[in-house]
């Protein structure tokens, strides 16, 4: 959260936000599954101005062998922001933030995966942020979960994610860049809706206990809406495949 420019209002007296949305409204979201031919699974997500590509490879053999787990697969996640993804060009390669978010995303996805079915292997997830506009970790989790499902990795449920936050004293859904920079708090949440489980819950900023609970409830509601979009994107891909198969008969 940064010091804000003088006179900047993030939300007006009618509850209208800086980008025209209402308090509890998500940014526009578009999802597509199976976008990379050479990956075992892949997905592309546009979320507001965020553009995120996720690719999954595996389960595959691990080298060196001492990294293998005899009882389960290991999940390796690499979250990377492309140098051109933000206005100020960033240095290529992982920085401390990317390493931290990679770990956070791995922790959010792991509870959904039946890793014991693939001992001594690795499942590699690559998340590339092509354009960043606040909420890249929840968009990354959402894209990675779709790519894992597309790769046919057995899962208890899809993982859907969304954030809520506080701007000008109001709890709102799905912060954009200005709200994230100049707001008071951000609460990203990831869930497995069918299991009623939370796999990620973080908070950046300051909230009272009541505000925190309201933000979590709102983020869960947003994640459930994201989950429906994930299911539609997967359905769309497999309807396409079915039509192609029928056409070839």
Curated annotation (Swiss-Prot):
What GO terms are given for molecular function? 3'-5'-RNA exonuclease activity; RNA binding
Q: Which GO terms describe its cellular component?
A: cytoplasmic exosome (RNase complex)
Pfam families found in the cross-reference section: RNase_PH, RNase_PH_C
Q: Which UniProt keywords apply?
A: Cytoplasm, Exonuclease, Exosome, Hydrolase, Nuclease
Question: Would you say which domain of life the source belongs to?
Answer: Archaea
| The keyword NADP appears for this protein | no
Location comes to:
Cytoplasm
Report the SUPFAM superfamilies cross-referenced here. Answer: Ribonuclease PH domain 2-like (SSF55666), Ribosomal protein S5 domain 2-like (SSF54211)
Q: What class of enzyme is it?
A: hydrolase
What EC numbers are recorded for this enzyme? 3.1.13.-
Q: How would you summarize the oligomeric state and partners of this protein?
A: Component of the archaeal exosome complex. Forms a hexameric ring-like arrangement composed of 3 Rrp41-Rrp42 heterodimers. The hexameric ring associates with a trimer of Rrp4 and/or Csl4 subunits.
Q: Which function does this protein serve?
A: Catalytic component of the exosome, which is a complex involved in RNA degradation. Has 3'->5' exoribonuclease activity. Can also synthesize heteromeric RNA-tails.
The entry sums up its family as follows: Belongs to the RNase PH family. Rrp41 subfamily.
What is the name of this protein? Answer: Exosome complex component Rrp41
What organism is this sequence from? Thermococcus kodakarensis (strain ATCC BAA-918 / JCM 12380 / KOD1)
